[in-house]
Curated annotation (Swiss-Prot):
Keywords from the UniProt entry: Coiled coil, DNA-binding, Nucleus, Transcription, Transcription regulation
Function: Probable transcriptional regulator.
Record-given protein name: Probable basic-leucine zipper transcription factor Q
Principal location class: nucleus
Gene3D superfamilies cross-referenced by the UniProt entry: 1.20.5.170
Amino acid sequence: MEEFENFFSQLIPAPDQDIWLLAAQQTPQNNDGVSTSGIPIGWSLQNLAASTNNIAAIDSNPQIREQLQQLQQQQQQQQTQIQQQLQSYQQQQQQHYQQRQQQYQQQYQQPYTTPSPPDQIDYNQQLSPQQQQQQQQQQQQQQQQQQQQPQLQQQNNTISQQQQQQNLNFQVQFLQQQQQHQQQLQQQQEQFQHQQLQHQQQQYFIKQQLQQQQQQQQQQQQQQQQQQQQQQQQQQQQQQQQQQQNQHLSPILSPLPPIQQLQQYQQQQQQQQQQQQQQQQQQQQQQPQQQSINIGSSNTPLQHQAMLQAQSLMDSINTKQPPIPPTLQSPTQHQFLNTPVLDQHILSSIRPSYSQVTKANISTLPTEITNSLTNFNGTNNSTPNFEDLTGGKLSSNNIKNTATPLSSPPSTKNGKQKQPKNNNNNNNSSNNNNNNNQTTTQQKQSKNNNSYGNNSNNNNNNNNFNNNKLKKQNDSTTTPTITSPNMTSPIDSNGDFDLLDEDEKKKSISRINQNLASRNYRQRRKEYIKEIESKMAALTFENHQLKKENESLKETGGVEVMRPEPELITMVVEGKQIIIQLSQALKKNDDRSLIYLLHLYHCAIAKRYSIVEREVEKIVHPYTQSKLAAMGYIPKSDKMFLNCIAGPAADSWFQLFKNEAEITLEQSNKLEALRTQHGKIDSALLQERQELDLDIKKFYYTKILVLPNNPLIIGDIPAQPYNGELSQSPISNSPLEISQLLDFAGKLESLKKNFILHRNLMLDTLASLSSILTPRQEAMLLVRVHFYTSYDFSHMELLKDVWTNIVSSKSITGPLNISEALKKLSDTTNTHHSIENIVKPPQFHQYTPKQLKFENQSNNFGNNNGSKSKNIENNLNNSVNNNNNNNNNNNNNNNNNNNNNNNNNNNNNNNNNSNSNNNNNVNSNSSNVNSNNNNFNNAPQMVLNPPSADAIPYPSTTQLDKRFQWVSYPSAPPPN
């Protein structure tokens, strides 16, 4: 007991001592360089101290911290476990001690006393025999304990060694983890440095690109500045030249009247403003700061002068005082009034109030201004050279007529004036004429005061006429020259104006009004045409969208629903290929290949459940059901899909098959039970389907298809198969309730389940045959019957043809005509088929639409069957043509239980009459004959080669017989 306590007390560390340093204490070493405790020399306290330093460096990593915390928690858990073990051991020892005391009391009936030390024992005392026995037992126990002590010591040593090894392994793992963390940190540092280098390189490249872009922008800015400086220099030179010319011409020239100036320079102002706006936009994109500086420095003096001149003009007009005469003005004012650049600024400053001033103040102009206007018209026979709106110079008549007297009229040619050749001569002549003009103006002012009213009206008319001509000449001619009738108007020798006659005035006024009216009419006509074109474009777009929607509805509404799934066709073709190989294996008696081929056949048809569900979803769709109800289609009793197994028609045939396949009594009993069970379930499903179809038709005819041509109102054919039940249901136009819609949806869902159950019943019956028959018997059944893979697509194709003819026809057909066509189709599908038609041989071509005629001609099953199928198809096509072309005159004659359709259309002269062997007269249009020939010529090639003679189950004996024969059945009904 004490030894165990000492051992465990050594294992428990002190609170200030780390448990991991116990195993690292220095121990005496052997010659091999390994310590007695099993720790190598390399693991010393120094290495551990270095590792702790590394740990302190790694403490910054949160992952390592979490791991260290986990390790500490594990250490604490181990300590608690050891303490719990010690406590449990002590408790066990105490319990064992108490049990021994109780045993002692029971045996000796005395309380247990602790033994005295060996010195106090009296050896001379005589012991009783019981005591002697006890002593002997104690001695034996002591001997046993002494013998067990080395074993316990060995166990303790082994336990201590194991713990030491565990501690060492844990330390090694811990150090390895530290090294791994250090390596990961180094790798992360290297990756981070590599990313920094990449980032620095990218920044360096970006800086270089930015510097290059900045240099390019600076170069562009410098080029633009140079261009602007050149333009400014050119403008300054032009202004200086104009000022020099105006200084020479200022004493000669008198200023134009303000109204005429405003009218002439209005267009010039608009064009220049547009140019300035374009330049400002370009400069704002490139140099927004330089723009403000250059514009402010170049235009401030001009704007100041323009504002002063505008104020003087406005004051003179409002106060009805004449402006300062040009002779009293300063040279700067002469320059201001005569330079076109300054006139532009005047117009720009007074442009907003121009229309108001002209309307309000023309009638109240002072007499002095009117006199100046009349004097200007009389004396100013020449105009100075000044810049036009577009920048060109106008020629002056005065310069040209310097050698002639003042009374002579100016010479013009085609309304255009010639520019002078010598500017020096022009300047001299203008100076000479200026003095004469100044003397005559003052004398004529007093004369013209009385004639202010007449002259003002004439001047206004002339100014309007001049402005219209100026606009036309600016639009039509490329040269910037402008001529006015004031300059070319005839004048007297005294310089007076010859007044226009009243007729000429009326003509000029009417001409101006006509021009304005025609211009307004042209503008309104253009706007109206644009509106009509936009409306037409919107209507064409809408019409195009409606056409697309109608085409998509036609495709998804009827034609595609009638077409079988491509997956179904591929499954049928695969089944046909496998059955051809089964027939070959039967001839060769190869049982192994039969089993393999049957397995392939069942795998190929394993997809039938999903395909059936998709086909049923198409048929049960509410849109398809509404189409069928609108057409008046009624589902007849379905032809038995498994007529070869179930039904009374298969009794005789099935008995022959049993004899040929050597079916046992047990197999025949199972087959008969399967047939009866199939018939019961099939009849129950058919009855349920008829009830559901009746309810759905009632819902459509009473709630949705409430039309004038409703079959219930007219008493049409669709109510007859239901025994008049549909006609008894009331018709209502009230809106549908939610309960009615839910009930209708539930009926559609139950119809879908009925279809799926019926199809799965057929397919499950086929699968259950394989569990009853042997592989050879099943192969014989599939090859002889081949009912599943000989899926007859003729009825589906005929339905598709009927629907496509209805959709593609131009004339509108009602649901009554469609119902008649479909009734005939349903009558043909319900004919009683013989066993020869049911038991078909395998077809050796892939199914494609529009191939029925080629199929009937290529497979020689008898002339009667071929002519019968042709008659049925031609009758259906002719019935559709009759319903489309002759809605009013439909004459149907029935002869020899066959439909003979006669086209009574006066416009169609292409009627082909053909007499069959069974006295069946079938008339078809030329379009139908051509379609038959085209289908025969353009038939697709066969996918599979025809089988060899060995593969045929019953080879023909003669050429006139059928290619594939079956045993003649005496009880089979004759073909119709």
